[in-house]
């Protein structure tokens, strides 16, 4: 049965599965739906039009579903959707969307979100990501599956971080990071710059030597040649056309991502 601490305040209109746990002094609002096996730690707030899936663990002092920090917001009924089996640690803040975008902030499943993380309005976070402590992403940011954000990193609004990419700790990111790429600060300051393909991460995820070699070639064309962006994109397209089926899949993801950039690619 649902375990609600006597000091918790759960609105009668909230929909909680039979085995949800709500800790001491926590607050659950009227438009909240929480799935089976999810636990809410002490002193946390879950509010807004928020849907949380199954098996999530929300730590103490988290604020989930708060109103967006956007001066254009006028109390529209925007949403936050969270998937399954996520860990959301203490003092994390996750806000609902705005009508200026899709009206929803989306968190996938199996994400590891550490302490003091901020996920702003209208963000889209995939599956199996890691947000190290104090990572902060501004509004409208997209984070792909298996991406890793280092501690105390900051991401500018509307930036995209591709699948399997990695952002180093204490880095400031203002442009898109292609899939499979490492971006981190360097000796010249905290602005994130490209640092190669995330080879170790790809090996751990089961990518083979041919796939990694193809991505390294694409990276060299984009970052280590004298080609313009359009010329590099065309050369990567030619590389994709010659690749076998296994190597082609990550190359296509890389090419499609850079072709769709609006803010430009991290340099």
From Swiss-Prot:
Presence of keyword tRNA processing: no
Catalysed reactions, as listed in the record: a (3R)-hydroxyacyl-[ACP] + UDP-N-acetyl-alpha-D-glucosamine = a UDP-3-O-[(3R)-3-hydroxyacyl]-N-acetyl-alpha-D-glucosamine + holo-[ACP]
Pathway: Glycolipid biosynthesis; lipid IV(A) biosynthesis; lipid IV(A) from (3R)-3-hydroxytetradecanoyl-[acyl-carrier-protein] and UDP-N-acetyl-alpha-D-glucosamine: step 1/6
Main location: cytoplasm
The protein's enzyme class: transferase
SUPFAM superfamilies, alphabetized: Trimeric LpxA-like enzymes
Lineage top rank: taxon: Bacteria
Keywords: Acyltransferase, Cytoplasm, Lipid A biosynthesis, Lipid biosynthesis, Lipid metabolism, Repeat, Transferase
Residues in coiled coil: none
Pfam families with a match to the protein in the record: Acetyltransf_11 (PF13720), Hexapep (PF00132)
Subcellular localization: Cytoplasm
InterPro entries, per the entry: Acetyltransf_C, Acetyltransf_C_sf, Hexapep, Hexapep_transf_CS, Lipid_A_LpxA, Trimer_LpxA-like_sf
Alphabetized GO MF terms: acyl-[acyl-carrier-protein]-UDP-N-acetylglucosamine O-acyltransferase activity
GO CC terms in record: cytoplasm; membrane
GO BP term (any one): lipid A biosynthetic process
CDD domains: LbH_UDP-GlcNAc_AT (cd03351)
Assembly with partners or alone: Homotrimer.
Annotated function: Involved in the biosynthesis of lipid A, a phosphorylated glycolipid that anchors the lipopolysaccharide to the outer membrane of the cell.
PANTHER family attached to this UniProt entry: ACYL-[ACYL-CARRIER-PROTEIN]--UDP-N-ACETYLGLUCOSAMINE O-ACYLTRANSFERASE (PTHR43480), ACYL-[ACYL-CARRIER-PROTEIN]--UDP-N-ACETYLGLUCOSAMINE O-ACYLTRANSFERASE, MITOCHONDRIAL-RELATED (PTHR43480:SF1)
Family statement: Belongs to the transferase hexapeptide repeat family. LpxA subfamily.
Protein name: Acyl-[acyl-carrier-protein]--UDP-N-acetylglucosamine O-acyltransferase
Protein's organism: Cupriavidus pinatubonensis (strain JMP 134 / LMG 1197)
Lineage of origin: Bacteria, Pseudomonadati, Pseudomonadota, Betaproteobacteria, Burkholderiales
Name of encoding gene: lpxA
